[in-house]
Amino acid sequence: LDFDAASDEESLLTFRNTFGPDSFAWEEARAVFIGLDDVIYQPGTKPAYIGGLRDDQFNFLEAYLPTVPKDRLLVLGVHIPLFDAKPGIETFRKTDRARLFALLKDFPHVLLLSGHDHTQRHVRHGAENDWHGATPLHEYNVGAACGAFWSGVKDAAGIPDSTMSDGTPNGYA
């Protein structure tokens, strides 16, 4: 995310020029993997971003998902979790979450992987979060290999242990 960009679209240019598309999919024998940039940059606001999806991403999903066999494992990777990380504060746009969940509800095997929070957490989405699939949707908030950035008790060399808030040590995600 380029915080110097004038718009959400411009904030993705460096990523796209370095790595390629910010929305993509690939298929393996029994699984389909979808990666989506779900960071919506809002220049000049506080906070400067919110979790959500763009119209072009929904267009991609609406065109692609009908081609995916329902017996495949569907793995979605995003950055910002789809659950609201802070009670009472919308950290992922509810309308986008409901729209995404409506597209996924007929897939019986879905795993949602998210990051951003530098902690590990398992969330089971149900009707209270607009998930209407046959079973709860499993979201695994993976944590971060860097741990909790440069925080925590310092070792003899002055390097902090960076243990995540859930107790996961640096280097494990």
Task: Please identify what each model-predicted range represents.
Residues V78, G115-H116:
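Active-site flanking residues adjacent to catalytic metal/cofactor-binding acidic residues
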Residues L65-K86:
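Short acidic, glycine-rich surface-loop motifs adjacent to enzyme active sites
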Residues L1-K70, E90-L113, T119-Y172:
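Extended active-site neighborhood of metal-dependent phosphoesterases/phosphodiesterases
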Residues L82, H118-T119:
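Alpha-helix capping/helix-boundary segments
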